[in-house]
């Protein structure tokens, strides 16, 4: 833990998000905090703005797969999986991999893409996995909406379920 690993997240996306953030009103932010239809599939000012599968993780996942030596025998968790796009691409790149997604909001799960991954609704602070049962856990832009106490609990849970404590935490805001 503690080493920097740049997966090369989409630079153009970060520029667009920065511009949109300046235009958001209080009402837009209220929609965003609900993490429902308006956030995922409404206006860009409310959140993702038409959050649809586009295969973007197919370009980034090979770096992660190589770095963490993921194979079809690996067990992977995407914590805060949203609509499951990363997991869908992971299953395309490594057929047969055991992959799980945890999301704590109904709308994203009900509108998730079809994939071989098992998607579970639960809080990030109480993961339904045995100790040291997962080869890799990614928490990408998922913990930032929690209070500090829950962030700490979530990080402890990630460490508890990870065999090697491989964690990728990222935010495109700063």
Feature-to-residue mapping (PLM):
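Class I SAM-dependent methyltransferase SAM/SAH-binding core
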Residues: 83-126
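Conserved class I S-adenosyl-L-methionine
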Residues: 73-82, 166-174
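A short glycine-rich, Lys/Arg-flanked "PGG" loop and its adjoining helix->strand segment in the class I
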Residues: 152-166
């Amino acid at each position: 833990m503690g080493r920097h690993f740049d997966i090369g997240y989409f630079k153009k996306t970060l520029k667009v998000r920065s511009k949109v953030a300046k235009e958001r009103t209080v009402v837009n932010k209220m929609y965003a905090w609900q993490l429902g239809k308006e956030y995922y599939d409404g206006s860009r000012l409310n959140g993702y703005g038409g959050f649809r599968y586009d295969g973007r993780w197919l370009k980034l996942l090979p770096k992660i797969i190589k770095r963490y030596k993921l194979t079809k025998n690996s067990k992977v968790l995407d914590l805060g999986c949203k609509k499951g796009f990363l997991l869908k691409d992971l299953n395309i790149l490594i057929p047969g991999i055991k992959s799980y997604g945890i999301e704590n909001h109904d709308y994203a799960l009900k509108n998730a893409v079809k994939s071989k991954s098992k998607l579970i609704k639960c809080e990030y602070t109480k993961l339904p996995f045995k100790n040291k049962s997962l080869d890799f856990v990614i928490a990408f832009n998922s913990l930032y909406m929690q209070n500090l106490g829950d962030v700490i609990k979530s990080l402890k849970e990630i460490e508890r379920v990870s065999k090697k404590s491989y964690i990728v935490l990222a935010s495109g805001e700063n």
